[in-house]
Protein backbone atom coordinates (compact mmCIF):
# COMPACT_ATOMS: atom_id res chain seq x y z
CA UNK A 1 0.00 0.00 0.00
CA UNK A 2 1.14 3.54 -0.70
CA UNK A 3 1.29 6.33 1.80
CA UNK A 4 -1.95 8.18 2.53
CA UNK A 5 -0.65 11.71 2.47
CA UNK A 6 0.02 13.47 -0.82
CA UNK A 7 3.80 13.42 -1.16
CA UNK A 8 3.97 14.08 -4.87
CA UNK A 9 5.38 17.55 -4.32
CA UNK A 10 8.36 16.01 -2.49
CA UNK A 11 9.05 13.77 -5.50
CA UNK A 12 8.64 16.02 -8.55
CA UNK A 13 9.27 13.19 -11.00
CA UNK A 14 6.50 11.00 -9.51
CA UNK A 15 3.12 10.91 -11.29
CA UNK A 16 0.06 8.79 -10.47
CA UNK A 17 -2.80 7.69 -12.68
CA UNK A 18 -4.74 6.08 -9.82
CA UNK A 19 -6.42 8.05 -7.00
CA UNK A 20 -4.27 8.40 -3.91
CA UNK A 21 -5.24 6.47 -0.79
CA UNK A 22 -5.94 9.78 0.91
CA UNK A 23 -8.82 10.37 -1.48
CA UNK A 24 -10.38 7.07 -0.44
CA UNK A 25 -10.15 8.10 3.21
CA UNK A 26 -11.73 11.47 2.40
CA UNK A 27 -14.45 9.65 0.47
CA UNK A 28 -15.27 7.38 3.40
CA UNK A 29 -15.46 10.37 5.73
CA UNK A 30 -17.74 12.19 3.31
CA UNK A 31 -20.18 9.26 3.30
CA UNK A 32 -20.33 9.35 7.09
CA UNK A 33 -21.17 13.05 6.90
CA UNK A 34 -23.60 12.61 3.99
CA UNK A 35 -25.72 10.07 5.87
CA UNK A 36 -25.50 12.06 9.12
CA UNK A 37 -23.95 9.14 10.98
CA UNK A 38 -22.69 10.59 14.23
CA UNK A 39 -21.58 7.53 16.24
CA UNK A 40 -18.91 5.64 14.32
CA UNK A 41 -16.31 2.95 14.95
CA UNK A 42 -12.92 3.10 13.21
CA UNK A 43 -10.93 0.00 12.29
CA UNK A 44 -7.58 0.14 10.52
CA UNK A 45 -4.73 -2.06 9.43
CA UNK A 46 -1.86 -1.92 11.93
CA UNK A 47 0.47 -0.18 9.49
CA UNK A 48 1.35 3.30 8.33
CA UNK A 49 -1.26 2.95 5.60
CA UNK A 50 -4.01 1.99 8.03
CA UNK A 51 -3.07 4.54 10.67
CA UNK A 52 -2.98 7.40 8.20
CA UNK A 53 -6.29 6.37 6.65
CA UNK A 54 -8.02 6.24 10.02
CA UNK A 55 -6.42 9.56 10.96
CA UNK A 56 -7.84 11.28 7.88
CA UNK A 57 -11.33 9.84 8.50
CA UNK A 58 -11.25 10.78 12.18
CA UNK A 59 -10.11 14.31 11.46
CA UNK A 60 -12.82 14.89 8.86
CA UNK A 61 -15.79 13.49 10.79
CA UNK A 62 -14.83 15.25 14.03
CA UNK A 63 -14.96 18.54 12.15
CA UNK A 64 -18.64 17.81 11.50
CA UNK A 65 -19.33 16.96 15.17
CA UNK A 66 -19.53 13.20 14.69
CA UNK A 67 -18.14 11.03 17.49
CA UNK A 68 -15.71 8.11 17.41
CA UNK A 69 -17.25 5.27 19.43
CA UNK A 70 -14.11 3.13 19.25
CA UNK A 71 -10.86 2.85 17.34
CA UNK A 72 -8.87 -0.35 16.90
CA UNK A 73 -6.11 -1.90 14.78
CA UNK A 74 -5.67 -5.23 13.04
CA UNK A 75 -2.21 -6.69 12.27
CA UNK A 76 -1.68 -7.89 8.71
CA UNK A 77 -1.30 -11.38 10.14
CA UNK A 78 -3.91 -11.26 12.92
CA UNK A 79 -3.56 -13.58 15.88
CA UNK A 80 -6.59 -15.13 17.61
CA UNK A 81 -6.24 -12.76 20.56
CA UNK A 82 -6.31 -9.74 18.22
CA UNK A 83 -9.40 -11.05 16.50
CA UNK A 84 -11.19 -11.76 19.78
CA UNK A 85 -10.39 -8.27 21.06
CA UNK A 86 -11.76 -6.53 17.98
CA UNK A 87 -14.86 -8.75 17.89
CA UNK A 88 -15.54 -7.97 21.56
CA UNK A 89 -15.13 -4.24 20.92
CA UNK A 90 -17.55 -4.25 17.98
CA UNK A 91 -20.10 -6.47 19.72
CA UNK A 92 -20.18 -4.33 22.87
CA UNK A 93 -20.21 -0.98 21.09
CA UNK A 94 -23.46 0.82 20.35
CA UNK A 95 -22.00 2.08 17.09
CA UNK A 96 -23.75 0.57 14.09
CA UNK A 97 -21.41 2.11 11.51
CA UNK A 98 -17.82 0.92 11.14
CA UNK A 99 -15.29 2.57 8.85
CA UNK A 100 -12.68 -0.04 7.90
CA UNK A 101 -9.36 0.98 6.39
CA UNK A 102 -7.90 -2.50 6.12
CA UNK A 103 -7.78 -5.53 3.83
CA UNK A 104 -8.26 -9.29 4.09
CA UNK A 105 -6.94 -9.28 7.66
CA UNK A 106 -10.48 -8.33 8.72
CA UNK A 107 -11.87 -11.64 7.41
CA UNK A 108 -11.44 -13.58 10.72
CA UNK A 109 -13.26 -10.74 12.49
CA UNK A 110 -16.20 -10.97 10.08
CA UNK A 111 -16.36 -14.73 10.49
CA UNK A 112 -16.42 -14.54 14.28
CA UNK A 113 -19.00 -11.75 14.26
CA UNK A 114 -21.18 -14.01 12.14
CA UNK A 115 -20.69 -16.96 14.48
CA UNK A 116 -21.57 -14.78 17.49
CA UNK A 117 -24.70 -13.45 15.80
CA UNK A 118 -23.53 -9.83 15.79
CA UNK A 119 -25.65 -8.26 13.04
CA UNK A 120 -26.95 -4.92 11.86
CA UNK A 121 -23.62 -3.19 11.26
CA UNK A 122 -23.01 -0.98 8.27
CA UNK A 123 -19.41 -1.23 7.08
CA UNK A 124 -17.74 1.48 5.04
CA UNK A 125 -14.62 0.10 3.41
CA UNK A 126 -11.79 1.18 1.14
CA UNK A 127 -10.55 -0.62 -1.97
CA UNK A 128 -8.15 -2.76 0.08
CA UNK A 129 -11.10 -4.64 1.55
CA UNK A 130 -12.58 -5.44 -1.87
CA UNK A 131 -10.37 -8.53 -2.08
CA UNK A 132 -12.70 -10.16 0.44
CA UNK A 133 -15.53 -10.15 -2.10
CA UNK A 134 -13.39 -12.21 -4.48
CA UNK A 135 -13.02 -14.96 -1.87
CA UNK A 136 -16.78 -15.65 -1.97
CA UNK A 137 -16.79 -16.25 1.79
CA UNK A 138 -20.44 -16.73 2.75
CA UNK A 139 -20.00 -15.57 6.36
CA UNK A 140 -18.21 -12.42 5.24
CA UNK A 141 -20.86 -11.68 2.63
CA UNK A 142 -23.57 -12.08 5.26
CA UNK A 143 -21.84 -9.61 7.58
CA UNK A 144 -21.07 -7.11 4.81
CA UNK A 145 -24.49 -7.18 3.16
CA UNK A 146 -25.85 -3.65 3.15
CA UNK A 147 -22.40 -2.09 3.46
CA UNK A 148 -20.70 0.49 1.25
CA UNK A 149 -17.31 0.35 -0.46
CA UNK A 150 -15.36 3.25 -1.97
CA UNK A 151 -12.99 2.22 -4.77
CA UNK A 152 -11.05 3.99 -7.55
CA UNK A 153 -13.15 4.42 -10.67
CA UNK A 154 -12.50 1.62 -13.16
CA UNK A 155 -13.10 1.58 -16.87
CA UNK A 156 -12.39 -0.76 -19.73
CA UNK A 157 -9.79 0.10 -22.34
CA UNK A 158 -11.69 0.27 -25.66
CA UNK A 159 -10.76 -2.73 -27.78
CA UNK A 160 -8.50 -4.36 -25.18
CA UNK A 161 -10.81 -7.27 -24.43
CA UNK A 162 -11.25 -8.13 -28.11
CA UNK A 163 -7.50 -7.83 -28.64
CA UNK A 164 -6.73 -10.24 -25.80
CA UNK A 165 -9.37 -12.71 -27.00
CA UNK A 166 -7.65 -12.81 -30.40
CA UNK A 167 -4.28 -13.74 -28.92
CA UNK A 168 -3.07 -17.25 -29.72
CA UNK A 169 0.44 -18.74 -29.80
CA UNK A 170 -0.12 -20.35 -33.19
CA UNK A 171 -0.95 -17.01 -34.82
CA UNK A 172 2.25 -15.43 -33.45
CA UNK A 173 4.74 -18.31 -33.22
CA UNK A 174 7.68 -15.90 -32.97
CA UNK A 175 6.25 -14.20 -29.88
CA UNK A 176 7.62 -15.94 -26.78
CA UNK A 177 5.60 -13.67 -24.51
CA UNK A 178 2.29 -14.94 -25.88
CA UNK A 179 3.47 -18.53 -25.42
CA UNK A 180 4.41 -17.81 -21.82
CA UNK A 181 1.13 -15.98 -21.25
CA UNK A 182 -0.83 -18.93 -22.66
CA UNK A 183 1.06 -21.39 -20.50
CA UNK A 184 0.45 -19.35 -17.34
CA UNK A 185 -3.25 -18.81 -17.96
CA UNK A 186 -4.08 -22.41 -18.86
CA UNK A 187 -1.45 -24.12 -16.71
CA UNK A 188 -0.02 -26.05 -19.64
CA UNK A 189 3.17 -26.20 -21.69
CA UNK A 190 3.30 -24.80 -25.23
CA UNK A 191 5.85 -27.06 -26.90
CA UNK A 192 7.34 -25.61 -30.07
CA UNK A 193 10.53 -27.64 -30.25
CA UNK A 194 9.09 -31.13 -30.23
CA UNK A 195 10.89 -31.89 -26.98
CA UNK A 196 9.54 -33.80 -24.06
CA UNK A 197 7.34 -32.38 -21.32
CA UNK A 198 9.02 -30.83 -18.30
CA UNK A 199 7.96 -30.80 -14.67
CA UNK A 200 5.11 -33.15 -15.55
CA UNK A 201 3.24 -30.23 -17.15
CA UNK A 202 0.53 -31.16 -19.61
CA UNK A 203 0.76 -30.01 -23.20
CA UNK A 204 -1.36 -27.12 -24.42
CA UNK A 205 -3.73 -28.42 -27.09
CA UNK A 206 -4.31 -25.10 -28.81
CA UNK A 207 -8.04 -25.59 -28.24
CA UNK A 208 -7.95 -23.56 -25.03
CA UNK A 209 -10.01 -20.37 -25.22
CA UNK A 210 -9.88 -17.17 -23.24
CA UNK A 211 -13.54 -16.51 -23.96
CA UNK A 212 -15.23 -19.86 -23.42
CA UNK A 213 -16.60 -18.95 -20.00
CA UNK A 214 -14.41 -21.41 -18.10
CA UNK A 215 -11.43 -19.07 -17.92
CA UNK A 216 -11.41 -16.24 -15.39
CA UNK A 217 -8.50 -14.27 -16.83
CA UNK A 218 -10.57 -11.38 -18.19
CA UNK A 219 -12.31 -10.95 -14.83
CA UNK A 220 -9.15 -11.19 -12.75
CA UNK A 221 -8.42 -8.40 -10.26
CA UNK A 222 -6.29 -5.81 -11.98
CA UNK A 223 -7.55 -6.40 -15.52
CA UNK A 224 -10.06 -3.58 -15.17
CA UNK A 225 -7.26 -1.34 -13.88
CA UNK A 226 -5.61 -1.43 -17.29
CA UNK A 227 -7.15 1.94 -18.11
CA UNK A 228 -4.80 3.52 -15.57
CA UNK A 229 -1.87 2.13 -17.56
CA UNK A 230 -3.61 3.35 -20.71
CA UNK A 231 -3.76 6.89 -19.27
CA UNK A 232 -0.11 6.72 -18.23
CA UNK A 233 1.06 5.66 -21.70
CA UNK A 234 -1.05 8.30 -23.43
CA UNK A 235 0.14 11.00 -21.02
CA UNK A 236 3.74 10.13 -21.79
CA UNK A 237 3.00 9.99 -25.52
CA UNK A 238 1.32 13.41 -25.48
CA UNK A 239 4.18 14.89 -23.48
CA UNK A 240 6.75 13.43 -25.87
CA UNK A 241 4.82 14.65 -28.91
CA UNK A 242 4.48 18.15 -27.45
CA UNK A 243 8.18 18.22 -26.68
CA UNK A 244 9.13 17.12 -30.19
CA UNK A 245 6.92 19.80 -31.75
CA UNK A 246 8.18 22.50 -29.41
CA UNK A 247 11.83 21.54 -29.69
CA UNK A 248 11.73 20.84 -33.43
CA UNK A 249 13.39 24.16 -34.15
CA UNK A 250 16.27 23.17 -31.88
CA UNK A 251 18.65 20.19 -31.94
CA UNK A 252 17.23 16.94 -33.30
CA UNK A 253 16.30 14.44 -30.64
CA UNK A 254 15.61 11.34 -32.69
CA UNK A 255 17.50 9.14 -35.05
CA UNK A 256 21.19 9.06 -34.38
CA UNK A 257 21.22 12.63 -33.10
CA UNK A 258 19.97 12.67 -29.51
CA UNK A 259 22.08 15.50 -28.17
CA UNK A 260 19.02 17.71 -27.62
CA UNK A 261 17.08 15.21 -25.50
CA UNK A 262 17.22 15.47 -21.73
CA UNK A 263 14.88 13.61 -19.33
CA UNK A 264 14.20 16.78 -17.35
CA UNK A 265 12.82 18.37 -20.49
CA UNK A 266 10.28 15.59 -20.92
CA UNK A 267 9.35 15.99 -17.26
CA UNK A 268 8.44 19.62 -17.86
CA UNK A 269 6.07 18.67 -20.67
CA UNK A 270 4.55 15.82 -18.67
CA UNK A 271 3.62 18.26 -15.90
CA UNK A 272 1.74 20.41 -18.43
CA UNK A 273 0.03 17.63 -20.38
CA UNK A 274 -3.75 18.07 -20.77
CA UNK A 275 -5.93 15.97 -23.09
CA UNK A 276 -9.10 13.90 -23.25
CA UNK A 277 -8.77 10.12 -23.16
CA UNK A 278 -10.92 7.66 -25.10
CA UNK A 279 -13.55 7.75 -22.35
CA UNK A 280 -13.91 11.50 -22.83
CA UNK A 281 -12.30 12.27 -19.48
CA UNK A 282 -9.80 15.07 -19.03
CA UNK A 283 -6.30 13.92 -18.14
CA UNK A 284 -3.91 16.30 -16.43
CA UNK A 285 -1.72 16.27 -13.33
CA UNK A 286 -2.02 18.56 -10.31
CA UNK A 287 0.87 19.90 -8.24
CA UNK A 288 1.15 16.53 -6.49
CA UNK A 289 1.40 14.59 -9.75
CA UNK A 290 -2.13 13.17 -9.37
CA UNK A 291 -4.97 12.96 -11.88
CA UNK A 292 -8.41 14.37 -11.00
CA UNK A 293 -9.79 11.87 -8.49
CA UNK A 294 -12.91 9.84 -9.18
CA UNK A 295 -14.19 7.16 -6.81
CA UNK A 296 -17.05 4.73 -7.31
CA UNK A 297 -19.42 3.83 -4.47
CA UNK A 298 -20.65 0.24 -4.31
CA UNK A 299 -23.37 -1.26 -2.12
CA UNK A 300 -23.04 -4.92 -1.11
CA UNK A 301 -26.25 -6.77 -1.99
CA UNK A 302 -25.80 -10.22 -0.45
CA UNK A 303 -23.34 -11.91 -2.86
CA UNK A 304 -22.89 -9.08 -5.34
CA UNK A 305 -21.81 -5.46 -5.35
CA UNK A 306 -23.98 -2.82 -7.00
CA UNK A 307 -22.83 0.59 -8.20
CA UNK A 308 -24.77 3.29 -6.34
CA UNK A 309 -22.80 6.48 -6.83
CA UNK A 310 -19.53 8.31 -7.22
CA UNK A 311 -17.33 10.92 -5.60
CA UNK A 312 -15.57 13.45 -7.81
CA UNK A 313 -12.61 15.44 -6.54
CA UNK A 314 -11.40 18.85 -7.63
CA UNK A 315 -8.27 20.85 -6.78
CA UNK A 316 -9.68 21.96 -3.42
CA UNK A 317 -11.29 18.70 -2.31
CA UNK A 318 -14.54 16.88 -2.99
CA UNK A 319 -16.26 18.55 -5.92
CA UNK A 320 -19.34 16.37 -6.27
CA UNK A 321 -21.04 13.47 -4.47
CA UNK A 322 -23.72 11.40 -6.19
CA UNK A 323 -25.64 8.68 -4.35
CA UNK A 324 -28.61 6.77 -5.78
CA UNK A 325 -30.58 6.32 -2.58
CA UNK A 326 -33.24 4.22 -4.28
CA UNK A 327 -30.65 1.55 -5.15
CA UNK A 328 -29.34 1.22 -1.59
CA UNK A 329 -29.94 -1.86 0.51
CA UNK A 330 -28.90 -1.68 4.15
CA UNK A 331 -28.05 -4.33 6.71
CA UNK A 332 -30.82 -6.92 6.71
CA UNK A 333 -31.63 -6.32 3.04
CA UNK A 334 -33.96 -3.38 3.67
CA UNK A 335 -34.02 -0.29 1.45
CA UNK A 336 -34.91 1.72 4.56
CA UNK A 337 -32.28 3.07 6.90
CA UNK A 338 -34.67 4.59 9.40
CA UNK A 339 -34.09 2.02 12.13
CA UNK A 340 -30.35 2.39 11.89
CA UNK A 341 -30.56 6.18 11.92
CA UNK A 342 -32.96 6.05 14.87
CA UNK A 343 -30.52 3.92 16.84
CA UNK A 344 -27.68 6.25 15.93
CA UNK A 345 -29.69 9.29 16.99
CA UNK A 346 -30.36 7.64 20.34
CA UNK A 347 -26.63 7.00 20.71
CA UNK A 348 -25.88 10.60 19.75
CA UNK A 349 -28.25 11.91 22.41
CA UNK A 350 -26.60 9.71 25.02
CA UNK A 351 -23.18 10.97 23.97
CA UNK A 352 -24.24 14.64 23.82
CA UNK A 353 -27.17 15.14 26.24
CA UNK A 354 -28.95 18.42 25.86
CA UNK A 355 -27.75 19.10 22.30
Language-model regions, residue ranges each:
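Extracellular ectodomain signature
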Residues: 1, 10, 18-38, 44-53, ...
Amino acid sequence: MGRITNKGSQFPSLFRTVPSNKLQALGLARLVIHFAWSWVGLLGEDSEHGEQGVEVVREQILKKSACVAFEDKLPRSPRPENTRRVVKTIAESQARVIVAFCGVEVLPVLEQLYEHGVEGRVWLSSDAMSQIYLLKNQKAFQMLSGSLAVVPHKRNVPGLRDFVLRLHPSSSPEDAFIQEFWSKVFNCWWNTSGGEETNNARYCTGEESLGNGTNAFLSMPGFDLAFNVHNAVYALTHALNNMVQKESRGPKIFGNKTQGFRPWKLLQYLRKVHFKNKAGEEVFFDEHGDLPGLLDIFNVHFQETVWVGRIEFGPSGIKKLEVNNTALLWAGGSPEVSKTIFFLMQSWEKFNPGK
